Structure formats: C-alpha cells, structure tokens
UniProtKB/Swiss-Prot annotation:
Residues 13-25, 98-107, 272-285 have a biased composition (Polar residues). Residues 214-277 form the bZIP domain. Coiled coil: none annotated. This is Protein FD. One of its GO terms (molecular function) is DNA-binding transcription factor activity. It is found in: Nucleus. The gene is FD.
Length: 285
C-alpha cells in the first residue's frame, strides 16, 4: 500500500510538472502570433499601452528554460514509472498529425499540436498458463497504421538528434507479451517432458546406434569377403596361365630335341667313309 501511494504521488507530481511546461509552451505559441500582429498594427494605429507590453514581457519565457523544464520533467517521470529501468529512454516529442499541419506553422505550434494528442486506451487481459498460474497482461491499443513521427532529443541544449521512434509504453507492452509467450512455451515443454519419460528416448537412441553399427559391420565384412574372393580368383588365373605356359615350353623343347637328333643321324649317313692308315703290329723296342 505504501509503495502504491508513493507511486501515485510521484505520478501526480510529474503530471503537474508537465502541465506547467505545457502552459509555458502554449503561452509562447500564443504570444508569437500576437506579437507579429501587434507589429503590423503599429504602423497604421497608435502604440499599445505600456501595461499590456509589460504583461506580455512577463509572460515570455526563453527557449532554454522551456527545454530545461521539459527535460527534467520527462526524465523524472521515466525514472519513477518505467517498468524496465535498464532501458534508458530519452524524452521525446512525437508529432502524429504532421501530414495535416500547416507548412507555415512554427515550432511552438508543432509542440502544441503534439502535446494535445489523446492517450491510447488500455485494457487488461488475464490468461492462464498450463501450469495453473494466471498472468495479467496490459495491452495498449493504438491506431493500426500510425503516421511517421518526428523524434527529437531534449538532452542537448540547442542541437537535435534523431532517435528511434519507439514509445516506452509500447516497448514495455511488447516485453510483457514476450515474457508471457516464453512462459507458455516453457510450461508446454515441461508438461510434454512430464508425459513422455526421458528413458524411452535414450533406449531408442541406443537401439538405433547399435543397429546402425551392426549394419555397418556386416557390410564391411561382406566387402572384405568379396575382395578376398576376387584376389584369390586373380591368383588362381595367374597360376593357371603360368602352368599352361610351362607345359607349352616343355613340349616345344622336346620337339626341338627330337628334331636335332634326326638331323645328326641324317648327316652321319650322308658322310662317306674315310681311308685311314692303320698299324698292323708294333715292334718291341
């Protein structure tokens, strides 16, 4: 209860600061056209009273003061009420109806038009996870096709930088949706794992691996047997070829030997007998 009361009090303080800055900005925007009209009317009519000019000077505020007030109020509001403090969102202005703006409008009119936009309606939806926990999600409804917005940084004094056009509320809403979906997916996975025991998956995987290794071993054994049979067949064919060649050479050798013997016999028959001197007796000396 104390934290909620503190939260509401801080929210009211930030709202009052914003209202003060809005009044200052509107006074600037209203004073600029009035000053231009007064300058044009002085040429044709008499000058305005000194009291009105003094009141107008008192109502004028410098641009640097307006920037500082807006910057401080926005930073205070974001630091107090941001659901995700780790995301450092910078204060920004978003003009949503810049297509319909007058091209001759000034920067004060742009600020006035951007601050007059209506807040988007929110709704809370309660969903139940499979594990029985109920989750409340805040949904922010906006236009389906928002026009492009001009985003300016207020931390730099006179310069402007272009920032991402994400709204902190929309970012927090998307984070809530993501967390809700992740919790649902985790609950579904846990319920599925509870229904199906993990041991069956391990057994099936082990059986598949054993069957695969057995099939590979059988195929390898068949290939080895086939290669051994092919090598034996090649060796046997080579041996048979050598044996045939040896037999052929042996037969050829026998034929050549017979032919040589025949030639020798024919030569001996054809050669005539030679006359030779023979000693009849020997003398004993």
């Amino acid at each position: 209860m104390l934290s909620s009361a503190k939260h509401q009090r801080n929210h009211r303080l930030s709202a009052t600061n914003k209202n003060q800055t809005l009044t200052k900005v509107s006074s600037i925007s209203s004073s600029s056209p009035s000053s231009s009209s007064s300058s044009s009317s002085t040429s044709s009519s008499s000058p305005l009273p000194s009291q009105d000019s003094q009141a107008q000077k008192r109502s004028l505020v410098t641009m640097e003061e307006v920037w500082n007030d807006i910057n401080l109020a926005s930073i205070h509001h974001l630091n107090r009420h941001s659901p995700h403090p780790q995301h450092n969102h910078e204060p920004r202005f978003r003009g949503q109806n810049h297509h319909n703006q007058n091209p001759n409008s000034i920067f004060q009119d742009f600020l006035k038009g951007s601050l007059n936009q209506e807040p988007a309606p929110t709704s809370q939806t309660t969903g139940s996870a499979p594990n029985g926990d109920s989750t409340t999600v805040t949904v922010l409804y906006s236009s389906p096709f928002p026009p492009p917005a001009t985003v300016l940084s207020l931390n730099s004094g006179a310069g402007f930088e272009f920032l991402d056009n994400q709204d902190p509320l929309v970012t927090s809403n998307s984070n809530l949706h993501t967390h809700h979906h992740l919790s649902n997916a985790h609950a579904f996975n846990t319920s599925f794992e509870a229904l199906v025991p993990s041991s069956s998956f391990g057994k099936k995987r082990g059986q598949d691996s054993n069957e695969g290794s057995g099939n590979r071993r059988h195929k390898r054994m068949i290939k080895n047997r086939e290669s051994a049979a092919r090598s034996r067949a090649r060796k046997q064919a080579y041996t048979n070829e050598l044996e045939l060649e040896v037999a052929h050479l042996q037969a050829e050798n026998a034929r050549l030997k017979r032919q040589q013997d025949q030639l020798k016999m024919a030569a001996a028959i054809q050669q005539p007998k030679k006359n030779t001197l023979q000693r009849s007796s020997t003398a004993p000396f």
